[in-house]
Amino acid sequence: MNVKPEEITSIIKSQIEKYEKKIETVDSGTIIQIGDGIARVYGLNGCMAGELLEFPNDVYAMALNLEQDNVGCVLLGSQEGIKEGNTVKRTGKVVEVPVGENIIGRVVNSLGHPIDGKGAISTTETRAVELVAPGVITRQAVKQPLQTGIKAIDAMIPIGRGQRELIIGDRQTGKTAIAMDTIINQKGKDVICIYVAIGQKQSTVAHIVNNLIETNAMDYTIVVSAAASESAPLQYIAPYAGCSMGEYFMNKGKDVLIVYDDLSKHAVAYRAMSLLLRRPPGREAYPGDVFYLHSRLLERAAKLSDKLGGGSLTALPIIETLAGDVTAYIPTNVISITDGQIFLETELFYSGQRPAINAGISVSRVGGNAQIKAMKQVAGTLRIDLAQYRELASFAQFGSDLDKESKRTLEKGKRLTEILKQPQYKPMAVEKQVMILFAASRNYIMDIPVERISEFEEEFLDYMDTHHREIGDEIKEKQVISDELSDKLRNAIEEFKKIFLIEG
């Protein structure tokens, strides 16, 4: 076989012509210490705060401490198989989560990966976990109601779209139950709900998801779960990830409700991370920026101006207190950040008052502007009536003789307290709330025995549905009780009472 030199020359020439020099520069560093989900890396000189770093075994980390000679970062995955001396690369990106319509109805972890066994989520858009809150000019006042379906809240502590309302109380007082009822009540109201579970037991999250599926609420809900078994960094970013998912819809002009359950565990996870990163501890061993941790999260809840689509993000953060102590560090921080709080009490819970809301110290600072006029008309005196009742009830314990007026106040208070009781997973439409509170506040239930109040309520609402549906429809449509409607409602109550008392 003859090989011509010219052929070899032409092949070499063509190879030289096609040769492309590819130089890829990667800013990399070396792990000098790793343990407890924290790594210290030497050599990442250009690293940004909050940047995503690539570790071996496809594990990523988030840079938090930028020190003179090393970078302190938290691992967003398992540290198994990673050791000192391994190489770490910069990605040049910050931590992002997938966002979009396809996440609705799914259960995801803090990084937006599905954990419900229903396969991958097909979405191309991502959004940074940490983003700056909307500015003053881009917002508008809270003026549209977000109905919870819970009589005590919608009447006395109304919540508006774009508000931050804290749910605070000891463990096992029904905090999550209020949040769940609020989510269930958004059915058909075109509100997207996000439930963020931070440091919860996996069995608890599974129970919540099952309830949402049974009540068909999962059709418009996203569940973000960072269970108690997850590492502190994943628990730390969970609420920010949920918030970014919600902001995507808010920026499209939609209304979003987000529940953070709960921020006490979130602060504990952040404290663990901070102490491992050797940041100086402050009060209750929390780091100095624990206020900023929650304020930058809750400030992202807003009602956007009409120019930006008028979308809203309403936040319901939950805080767990110890023995009712609201003066602890985290509770006082979050109370000062939010626009009001719903305070739940153990004593009320065990005395059968459920939801166990203490109306005396629960408040909504901006929700009053969002409350519908019909509710204002019937619930205006409710808080004062209950306050007078509580004051008299504690006085009456001593067995002193009471005058007629005081006895009447006590009797009315007992009935109002009974009316405000409500079973779980049974949120009530606002027009029904208005009708029953109209009967209660206008003294139409004074001759009904206390033990028959719940029976009266149920049968009265059934009666109104069957015989006077137009009254409920008018309240729903016009959101105000005119003199004419008031007379119709009075007559309907009188009619029903005759039947009820005869049957009784």
UniProtKB/Swiss-Prot annotation:
A GO cellular component entry from the record: proton-transporting ATP synthase complex
MF term (GO), any: ADP binding
Keywords, in A-Z order: ATP synthesis, ATP-binding, Cell membrane, CF(1), Hydrogen ion transport, Ion transport, Membrane, Nucleotide-binding, Translocase, Transport
Residues annotated as site: Required for activity: 362
EC number per UniProt: 7.1.2.2
Signal peptide: none
Reactions catalysed according to its record: ATP + H2O + 4 H(+)(in) = ADP + phosphate + 5 H(+)(out)
Lipid bilayer topology: Peripheral membrane protein
InterPro entries, sorted: ATP_synth_asu-like_sf (IPR023366), ATP_synth_asu_C (IPR000793), ATP_synth_asu_C_sf (IPR038376), ATP_synth_F1_a_nt-bd_dom (IPR033732), ATP_synth_F1_asu (IPR005294), ATPase_a/bsu_AS (IPR020003), ATPase_F1/V1/A1_a/bsu_N (IPR004100), ATPase_F1/V1/A1_a/bsu_N_sf (IPR036121)
Residues involved in ATP binding: 169-176
Record localization: Cell membrane
Chief location category: membrane
Pfam families: ATP-synt_ab (PF00006), ATP-synt_ab_C (PF00306), ATP-synt_ab_N (PF02874)
PANTHER family: ATP SYNTHASE SUBUNIT ALPHA, MITOCHONDRIAL
Record's subunit section: F-type ATPases have 2 components, CF(1) - the catalytic core - and CF(0) - the membrane proton channel. CF(1) has five subunits: alpha(3), beta(3), gamma(1), delta(1), epsilon(1). CF(0) has three main subunits: a(1), b(2) and c(9-12). The alpha and beta chains form an alternating ring which encloses part of the gamma chain. CF(1) is attached to CF(0) by a central stalk formed by the gamma and epsilon chains, while a peripheral stalk is formed by the delta and b chains.
Task of the protein: Produces ATP from ADP in the presence of a proton gradient across the membrane. The alpha chain is a regulatory subunit.
Family indicated by similarity: Belongs to the ATPase alpha/beta chains family.
Protein name in UniProt: ATP synthase subunit alpha
Source species of the chain: Clostridium kluyveri (strain NBRC 12016)
Phylogenetic lineage: Bacteria, Bacillati, Bacillota, Clostridia, Eubacteriales
Gene it is expressed from: atpA
